[in-house]
Amino acid sequence: HKAFGVATQDEFFEKIKMKKKIYIIGFMGTGKSYWGKVWAKNHQMPFMDLDSLIEEKEKGKVLDIFEQKGEEFFREVEADCLRSTLPFDNSIIACGGGAPCSHNNMEWMNENGLTILLEATPAEVFENIKKETRSRPLLKDKNEGEVIFFIEKLMNERKSFYDQAQIKMP
């Protein structure tokens, strides 16, 4: 990520490994899965994607789970899958954008690992996700103006949770 200088990366990850697990959080389109995979590869750490764990458990895509069973059901499964990462020390876990915001997940992640927030502006998020809004459950039926407005609104709603991250990376 922009804040990651090569000179400090090894030292940074040695500190992080003392915390056992790394939970990468942030809004959709901030690069959580991308950077999680990069950091995991560079530091020989296992990588897990929370949405993939959910899809595996429910045998379906996040979008379909959202549509067929609703957000409340999805958030319950998400919380269960998040807690299933507890035994996996020295792992990097990329979380869905809304994961920190329900079921005391943020508090749980802070107690059981290190939370890193990847930050981005609404414009940066839109640039990163504009080609894939149809696959994003919260955005799929919105036009460009509605998507940007929705991103700003949802970012504001999630801010109090994201602000609890132990490390923030712009």
Task: Annotate each predicted stretch with a short phrase.
Residues 33:
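Walker A/P-loop
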Residues 12-17, 42, 156-170:
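NTP-dependent small-molecule kinase module
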Residues 24:
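Hydrophobic anchor at the beta1->P-loop junction of P-loop NTPases
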Residues 27:
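P-loop (Walker A) phosphate-binding loop of NTP-binding proteins
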Residues 50-110, 135-137:
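ATP-dependent small-molecule kinase phosphotransfer cores
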Residues 112-157:
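A glycine- and Lys/Arg-enriched "phosphate-lid" helix/loop adjacent to the NTP-binding pocket
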Residues 30:
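ATP-binding Walker
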